[in-house]
Amino acid sequence: MAKLRSATTTEGRKRAGARALWRATGMTDSDFGKPIIAVVNSFTQFVPGHVHLNQLSELMGETITAAGGVPKEFNTIAIDDGIAMGHGGMLYSLPSRDLIADSVEYMVNGHCADAMICISNCDKITPGMMLAALRLNIPVIFVSGGPMEAGKTKLANIDIKLDLVDAMVKGADESVSDADSDQVERSACPTCGSCSGMFTANSMNCLLEAIGLALPGNGTTLATHKDRKQLYVEAGARIVDLCREYYQKDNQEVLPRAIANKTAFMNAMVVDIAMGGSSNTVLHLLAAAQEAGVDFDMSHIDALSRKTPFLCKVAPATPEYHIEDVHRAGGMMAIVRELGKAGLVDMSVNHVAGSTMAELVKKWDATDPTNEAARKFYRAGPAGIRTTKAMSQECRWDEGDNDREHGCIRSVEHAFRQDGGLAVLSGNLAVDGCVVKSAGVVDDMLHFEGTAVVYESQDDSVEGILNDEVKAGDVVVIRYEGPKGGPGMQEMLYPTSYLKSKGLAEKCALITDGRFSGGTSGLSIGHVSPEAASGGAIAYVENGDKIIIDIATREITLALSDAELEARKQKQLARGKQAYKPLDRQRYVSSALKAYALLATSADKGAVRDLAKLEELS
């Protein structure tokens, strides 16, 4: 039987001081000996996806207490990528993932907590907590704050659904009137919750269901809906059960590394590809696999992408469907079910819910006419009322979406596309690979040949696009924005949004060693590895070079001979200490960001810390 970690601070006469401090937090004699559950919250008033998370604390605490645990809450930081977008604030977004992971480790190990409930929601917070959970390897359940309702308004007498990206595109489109732009802005983000499309936050919260660390409905039940209360209650009770399983029965199969094993990572990636998840998920799953000690890299993702169909097309790939529609169609359990029918995922894996994936999928099958609980659950829908209050409405669709031929979630036979929504490309421009969200690429752009227009920073690219330097047929190349070169690997949502506003989204490509928001669509290729700052070939591209992109063959090619590439390499090396650094870029880089850059690896490694370099320095 494993001993409670918290016994280190609660047992024996020599721990009188620690117990005295615990008593000052409200603990009593009856609490000592119970599992201490760290309620890892991320409430902040800066982020709509987190603005309501303080409303969950009391509920979670009451549930854990009733189940026989002792809840102790602390908070992490949370950066809103949408607000940090397009200025120096975005440099801090990806580095915050590691800071969050470290802060969770510090708090949990510093106080010897026995288990964790991770209340996350947005882009880097869920991955950061996931890294910590796999690093610590103690019982854990993730519960997100839930997705935002899709925005809705009427323009030109047409009812339309909206999200954050629409506000950005309309705001940059000079042909849109001030009144229409203002109307879209005011309608795009109507409630608390993570932004309403298949963007990074929702992608990660959905994948936690698929990898087995979050309960069904975690990724798709709206933040405003009362059904989330039951999700939180079940999670609070279940985490105490997991503590009993591990600490009293020595059942190590309930630990996160046992659940999120290689098979589970492969399952999650298949689901990710099938649902057209954000390309950032590749970055985060690679990083999480390293923390879990799982052999999972770009080659696995490439192989899976070639055989996984695209089953769920959601904004930003289409304006027709948002996350609320995915829930109506049966959520992640429905996608897993369709993939399972085709033998594309392993249904025997375990789950924090206490069953195999096969059992869980059957339990939550909303297509079963006799399964009233599942059918009701997946009909939870939006209320259309502006609010920041969680669990405040109980509207339901009149009926679910079980149309697997024409609906939001398709069967394999009726897939939107037989190759999936994410693809890994490689070639002389990206020897270690790069990633494209192919779900957002129109068929006419799956093969593209264009002329390079090179920028040394995102800021310069935005200025160039808005000043009409980019024309149809061009390939915008933005470099020195990788993990080390940025530093911080900024998202390029503004450049892609401005290409849309200029009518070039389906006429140009964009390539970067940075990354993209989950809200990006179009032929947007990121995570180019090695990055420019690490000597990658993207550093050698010059204006006017021909670049060939072929998603079907998974190739990306800079049309230069090996001899010319070598000549350009020597030209770069001749710059001495300035080699592989941007020309004339004016950017303040703080000591915190310099520390991040010192250990950052390229995107193909998940942009994690270079542990070999860390060992050299220690």
From Swiss-Prot:
Obligatory cofactor(s): [2Fe-2S] cluster; Mg(2+)
Q: Which residues carry this modification: N6-carboxylysine?
A: K124
Gene Ontology molecular-function annotations = 2 iron, 2 sulfur cluster binding; dihydroxy-acid dehydratase activity; magnesium ion binding
Q: Which InterPro entries match?
A: Dihydro-acid_dehy_C (IPR042096), DihydroxyA_deHydtase (IPR004404), DiOHA_6PGluconate_deHydtase_CS (IPR020558), ILV_EDD_C (IPR056740), ILV_EDD_N (IPR000581), IlvD/EDD_N (IPR037237)
Q: Which GO terms describe its cellular component?
A: cytosol
Q: Which reaction does it catalyse?
A: (2R)-2,3-dihydroxy-3-methylbutanoate = 3-methyl-2-oxobutanoate + H2O; (2R,3R)-2,3-dihydroxy-3-methylpentanoate = (S)-3-methyl-2-oxopentanoate + H2O
Write the Enzyme Commission number(s) for this entry: 4.2.1.9
Give the pathway: Amino-acid biosynthesis; L-isoleucine biosynthesis; L-isoleucine from 2-oxobutanoate: step 3/4; Amino-acid biosynthesis; L-valine biosynthesis; L-valine from pyruvate: step 3/4
User: Which residues are Mg(2+)-binding?
Assistant: D81, D123, K124, E491
Instruction: Provide the binding site for [2Fe-2S] cluster.
Output: C122, C195
Q: Which Pfam families match?
A: ILV_EDD_C (PF24877), ILVD_EDD_N (PF00920)
Q: Which UniProt keywords apply?
A: 2Fe-2S, Amino-acid biosynthesis, Branched-chain amino acid biosynthesis, Iron, Iron-sulfur, Lyase, Magnesium, Metal-binding
Single Gene Ontology BP term? L-valine biosynthetic process
Q: How is the cofactor bound?
A: Binds 1 [2Fe-2S] cluster per subunit. This cluster acts as a Lewis acid cofactor.
Q: Which residues form the active site?
A: S517 (proton acceptor)
Bridged cysteine pairs (disulfide): none
What's the subunit arrangement here? Homodimer.
The record's similarity note reads: Belongs to the IlvD/Edd family.
What this chain does, per the entry, is described as: Functions in the biosynthesis of branched-chain amino acids. Catalyzes the dehydration of (2R,3R)-2,3-dihydroxy-3-methylpentanoate (2,3-dihydroxy-3-methylvalerate) into 2-oxo-3-methylpentanoate (2-oxo-3-methylvalerate) and of (2R)-2,3-dihydroxy-3-methylbutanoate (2,3-dihydroxyisovalerate) into 2-oxo-3-methylbutanoate (2-oxoisovalerate), the penultimate precursor to L-isoleucine and L-valine, respectively.
Protein name in the entry:
Dihydroxy-acid dehydratase 1
Organism, as annotated:
Pseudoalteromonas translucida (strain TAC 125)
Q: What gene name is given for the protein in this entry?
A: ilvD1
